[in-house]
Amino acid sequence: MVSLPTLVFVHGAWHGPWCWDLVIERLSGVDIRAIALPSSGHDPSKLGDLYNDAEIVRSIVADVDGPVVVCAHSYGGAPVTEALVGVRKVRHLVYLCAWQGNVGDSLLGARHGIPPPWWEMHEAEGYIDPLRPREIFYGDVDPPTAKAAIARLGHQSLAAVSQPLTQASWRNISSTYVICEKDCAIPPAAQEQMARRAHRVKRLDTSHSPFLSRPSRVADILRNELRAAAAD
């Protein structure tokens, strides 16, 4: 039996490795690493930036013995895109309603410097908080699960969403884009545009957080991607 690659999870803004727990429970037998990005956290004075995040992603992947598939959610697509150019052990990237930007792009720059109305900006302190997270992130998540997730959200580094990508790993690593068709954080139309950069496109009829609303479906998609990567 062919062994599967290691799966590395990279969370999005305001979140942490905890957001993957329900998916991880459904991936028995898979070697998994869930990264904590320094740009998200509960102490605004200690938040890192995009390049700190990319360094962590590179470091965790480097520590894996064998092939790797990386799954990024939302903002997590930015450090993954930045970090993995030339890392040959990475067999495939999965962008789960994630930011698959190009060289020179930043999340804020993609909006011409105008933040979404649901970003609460703390520019002097260098961080952002989400307004209306229940509506924006968790529209199809059951109320107890959504409430627990909201209680765990941290602050997000403003620098991380302002800094440009200096390289794009999806140019030399194959990728799958998973479009979330009821997403209120990253508009599905924007996801459709980014998905043109991917080798495969899948769709979920979910909000921005399918790892909470449809964890079994996300796990199925990822197991299939791991099998495909192992067979290549």
What are these regions (language model features)?
Residues L4-D43, V68, G86-K89:
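Conserved HGGG/HGGXW glycine-rich cap/lid loop of the alpha/beta-hydrolase fold
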Residues L37-V69, L84-V85, L108-H112:
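Active-site loop/oxyanion-hole signature of alpha/beta-hydrolase fold enzymes
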Residues C71-G76, V80:
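Gly/Ala-rich beta-loop-alpha elbow adjacent to hydrolase catalytic centers
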Residues V85-P130, S157-V161, T166, I186-P187, ...:
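Flexible "cap/lid" loop of the alpha/beta hydrolase fold
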Residues G126-S169:
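Conserved alpha/beta-hydrolase catalytic His-Asp/Glu region
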Residues I173-I179:
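Catalytic His-Asp charge-relay segment
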Residues C180-D205, S209-L212, R217, N224-E225:
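Conserved loop-alpha-helix segment in the C-terminal half of the alpha/beta-hydrolase fold
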